[in-house]
């Protein structure tokens, strides 16, 4: 419903909560997902999350878009961050106030994945078979 109304900030929070739920009770209680938990997430659920983001953002957002952009920059995360608006002039975008929560955001801007713990979580999501098949090429 939040995606339908283009309430992207709340949709992003719900996406994060759902990823924790998919990872299991321990992740829910801890409040974040370890990259090693992604491989056990049901592909159908990740695929659904990706499809919903793509549909309700007019094709602009979603994990498969992020994977496509990452591939286009030679799989270099340091080049991905500025392209999707998570980093500008070498400075990380502050959450949530400095993120763009509208269709004016760069392609791949959402959903957000916590980068405080490095790139492993995002990399695991983008390499999950259900996401990889959506952009027709494994990373």
Regions found by a protein language model. Give the residues of each.
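Surface-exposed peri-terminal alpha-helical interaction modules
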Residues: 1-139
């Amino acid at each position: 419903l939040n995606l339908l109304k283009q309430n992207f900030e709340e949709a992003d929070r719900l996406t994060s909560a759902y990823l924790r739920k998919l990872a299991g009770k321990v992740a829910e209680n801890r409040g974040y997902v370890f990259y090693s938990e992604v491989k056990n997430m049901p592909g159908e659920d990740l695929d659904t999350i990706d499809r919903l983001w793509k549909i309700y953002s007019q094709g602009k957002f979603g994990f498969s878009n992020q994977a496509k952009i990452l591939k286009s920059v030679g799989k270099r995360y340091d080049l991905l961050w500025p392209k999707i608006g998570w980093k500008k002039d070498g400075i990380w975008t502050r959450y949530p106030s400095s993120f763009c929560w509208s269709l004016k955001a760069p392609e791949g801007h959402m959903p957000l994945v916590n980068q405080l713990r490095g790139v492993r979580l995002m990399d695991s999501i983008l390499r999950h078979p259900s996401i990889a098949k959506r952009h027709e090429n494994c990373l």
